Amino acid sequence: MSHGTKYRDALLFSLTLYDVNTGKSRLKELYAAVPGIRKSLLGVHAKRFGEQYHHLQRRRSVSSRGGSLRGSMDSLNDSGQNGAEDVIGVEDEEEAQKFRGKRTSISLDPAAAGEVMFTIEDGACFPSGGLANTHFQQRVINVSNAPPVSLKREKSGEWEIKQGSGGLVSCVDPIMSVNQENMWLANLGMNIDKKKMLRSTELLNVTDDSAPLAPATNTLGLPLMRQALADVLFHVIADDDIKEQNEDEQSRNVRWGHSSVEAGGVAPSQPWEEMSLLGVLNQYNRSNYKLNPVVVQEQDYNVYYGGISNGLLWPALHNLPEYIVADYDDPKVLYEHWCAYVRVNYQFAIDAVRNSRPQDFIWIHDYHLMLTGMIMQSLDSSLEIGFFLHIPFLPPDNFFTKYRLCAFPIMRGLLRFTKVGFQTHRDRAKFVELVGIHLPTARVTYDEKMDIHTVTYQGWSCSLGVFPVSIKNEDFLKVAQSAETIKKADDIRKEILGETPVDSARLLFSVERFDYTKGIKEKLLAYRRYFERHPDRIGKDVLYQVAVTNRRSVDTYRMYQDECIQMAEDINREFATDEYPNWKPLIFRTDGLQRADLVAHYLAMDVGVVTPKKDGMNLVAKEMLVCNPSAGLVLSTGAGSEIQFTMAGLHPDDGDKCYHRVVDVYDADHYADAFYEAAVEPEGERAAHGQRLNEFIMNNDIERWSTAFLDPGWSHLVIRQSEIKDLDDFYSLMMRTRDVRRQIVERVLKGIPIRSHFSISLSNTKESLLLACQPGTRTLHLKPSLEEDEQTEPAHFDIANELDEFEKDLNFMKFIQSDDVYNVEQFINSLQEYHPVSADKFRDEVIELGDVLTEADHFNFFFTDRDGTLKSYSCSYPASIQPAYSGVIQAQFARRCAQTCAIVTTAPLMRIGVLDVSTIPEGYYYFGASAGREWFIDPANKFKDQSIPEEDLELLERVFAAISDLLEEPKFKHFTWVGSGLQKHYGHITIAHQDAFNSVPRHQVRAIDQKIKDIIHRIDPDQHTLKVKETETDIKIFLKSESGEIFDKGQGIRLLVEHMKCDISNGTILVCGDSSTDLPMLQACLEANPSGVYTVWVTRSDELKTTVRELCERFGNKNFVFVSCPEVLLGGMAQATIREISIGRPGPRASHDSE
């Protein structure tokens, strides 16, 4: 078995190396020919068992608490025959794709006790926790060479784990910490060295803490763990289940911890977890996202990390060829080290795929792992894999000739990621340029609006974006604003500059890793030149340089660091003066600062100095100005942050420059001039410039960066064509289109491209509905459920409106993705064919509506009805999903043309209410349901009318129960799905007796109306509490208010105004409605602000038009307009969003603009 595994691994790696070097796909061909190899490599069966066990635990906790363990285990065994991974692990990739297509179909299994099941066409099924996917939610799987933690083993033998503080951790931790199911794969510095492998009996006695640490450090600057401790890790993993009775006393003491046992303590219940590394990791994973170690051969790792990554790729991508290790001039050394790099990338890729699920987003970081995407795609082509390069991408001109062996595979490897993010436009432009030169068959397109390059090469497409990394502002501000830090900063200034420094004395501060890319040597040369050119600054200015030592095991680093330290000593000796005996021109320290101390130094400084030769971003400049907005800044063009600041207009060629730019760090004279300009800059100007930088950084923090990168423009979830037989099929399908439409709306609003699968999903849904219609009609005849017999009256739905909305959405996506700047106008014009009169009438009404909206310019408040106003009536309320185009138009109107927006409807809030059918993201609109008697502001802010007595609600509940019983009778059962059906609102009940198409016979309407009146009379004979109101489409049962009146939308508006402390007496108000139930809303606004109200009514009823006109004129208001259909209103709103307005978009929805 062992020899077979070794042969398999050797074969797979050989094919991987061949594919990487040649761009072929031999590995994928092997998996297709012998699928068992892939299943074995990825541990498919183990993963299947783990997920089924997870599901078993979940089912037992929520629905099987009263059942026996035997029954639960039977359930696991049964599901094991048809589990998801069993289906995924089919004989080839083509079959796996078939499964992914099948898994989107759903039905209700009566035997599942109401549990939603996924159904496969061959009859196999597996339980699910929701309608559209499994109970496993989408996770972010973060993959990096270095871990987000530091590890330390105490002398007692116990391990200590602490959260890391490096740049990568700061960038990614906010998004990772959101979900504890997120996973971080990294190398902990513990790897396999076969030459040093010990027997497991010897490993139990490893207590020597004097063994030397590994010579290299990881990318966070943390030392790699020694080999002996790596062996302990493997021993723990392998022998965790050793029975205590088989251990000797010494071994047992090691497992329990010497101190506790020798002191007479009680052995812990889980002794390994007291001291083993595995136990520490398990404990960490219980309270954080999951941290999984990636273990590789130590010899490979040392060459991969300390060799080719830092000796070749690091200096090459920084365009510092003079620091490339000379050993790589030897083709043999280059090949051997390249093979090690591929092997480590191969192991990372396998671990990532093993730990991933189909819905996960896998995020790979930095130059150590540039081949993982290519290898992972060969294992599973459906994965969504993103890559972010934290360093520059500026290889030298000879990179593709002298180092051809690795240069071309790196280019091909990066193009196999779904999305690649660069720090700056400079880096991306270089990559695109090199693609055009060295991969001539690649097709490159550019979306100017989105600023996204898409490269298609060898059948794969990759999006290239620019995502400047930032910092988590709150973490630094919290420290900077503390009294202790402020006092510490004052102490630092006094210690360095003296108790009474001269007014012109300046403290310059710089902090970075002791790396040749940071330009420390050039900085020291310029600082010496500064005093030579400006001797008047001697005795006044001090440069405080922190250069944190790392990578001293690498010769180039050690020599560079020693040279800089000597230069620092020379400067202090050269410029020492008797006139200022306590003055020291340069403070040079090589140990790091804790965050509190670092921030205190930021507060103490007058000028920050950030002048790398080349850097991906360099967050130090941002940290400095967030903490100390009154400080000056000397910044080199080698920093990615300088490029970002320049593009933001903070250092224009002609105009006010917010920092002092060093164009060439090798030009000591100009560099010294930048020092001088910063030192003598007036404090007022310096503070003004720092404030502008501060505002920019505050508006572009790390959460915006991670959100922008992780927001996908693609999805592997597609709605397939399906057969619609019963109501559940129909409503389930419509709810799934709601989810797709929500994604479309969110992506359009955020400016993320709409990928083809959204259109495919909507097109497939439309085709499914058309196929289900009666021949030659747009009418569905559906069984109430599959359990009903053939004699049951089917539900009849005229779905003409639903089909039209799908067509509009498909047109909308075509227009919105076009490059034509007039695509919005083109889409508005496409709506004219849906006008009930004519296209000319549509255009006239849009123009008239536009005049009203333009006159108002910007609305302080926007109150509107939904059904009949913003959307045409549907065949039933569960099917009245808001189209994507409508959601975008309404959200854009709320963002650009109004401040406080609210949708007020008579529908309930939830349980097939307005929130269930809306596609607008949270934050754009408030939702007032039940005529405004219950409000949803955001998930943390909901409120209701508190004036309803509890006994009245109980009375209404009795009415609801009685009507529900009535609808169980065969004669009235079809009213369940007529129109909005039976709905329980907060404060009233609605039962539809007619649909929008008048398809219910009049005698049936009269019959159910009489039955309902009989129920009301029986429960409330004197109608002291209840009041019945009939409309054309429904009958409503209201609870009377304290005054005896029915709660209406006008009172709903007043409830909102009172609760949210709105002042509607000032400013402008837009009110939209379509029926008499909306009139109280208009009247309430007119009473509060007669001249500021503008109103739009979607109606063709002359009677309603007269009522609206008279109501407005009674208040001296002439700002009203009538349109014939919701498409006109939406067209006018869309037109309003693309015109110039005089008032910007403030308020809580500003966050959407930043996104």
Curated annotation (Swiss-Prot):
Pfam families, A to Z: Glyco_transf_20, T6PP_C, T6PP_N
Which Enzyme Commission numbers does its entry carry? 2.4.1.15
Which is a Gene Ontology cellular component entry for this protein?
cytosol
Q: Some GO term, biological process aspect, for this entry: which one? A: trehalose biosynthetic process
Per UniProt, the enzyme's principal EC class comes to transferase
InterPro entries per UniProt: Glyco_trans_20 (IPR001830), HAD-like_sf (IPR036412), HAD_sf (IPR023214), T6PP_C (IPR049063), T6PP_helical (IPR041064)
Q: Which GO terms describe its molecular function?
A: alpha,alpha-trehalose-phosphate synthase (UDP-forming) activity; trehalose-phosphatase activity
Tagged with keyword Glycosyltransferase: yes
Q: Which domain of life is it from?
A: Eukaryota
Reactions that this protein is recorded to catalyse: D-glucose 6-phosphate + UDP-alpha-D-glucose = alpha,alpha-trehalose 6-phosphate + UDP + H(+)
Give the transmembrane region(s): none
Region ranges (Disordered): 56-94
**From start to end residue, where is composition biased (Low complexity)?**
63-72
Keyword terms:
Glycosyltransferase, Transferase
Family stated for the protein in its record: In the N-terminal section; belongs to the glycosyltransferase 20 family. In the C-terminal section; belongs to the gob-1 trehalose phosphatase family.
Function, as annotated, reads: Catalyzes the production of trehalose from glucose-6-phosphate and UDP-alpha-D-glucose in a 2 step process.
Q: What is the name attached to this protein's record?
A: Alpha,alpha-trehalose-phosphate synthase [UDP-forming] 1
Q: Which organism is it from?
A: Aphelenchoides avenae (Mycophagous nematode worm)
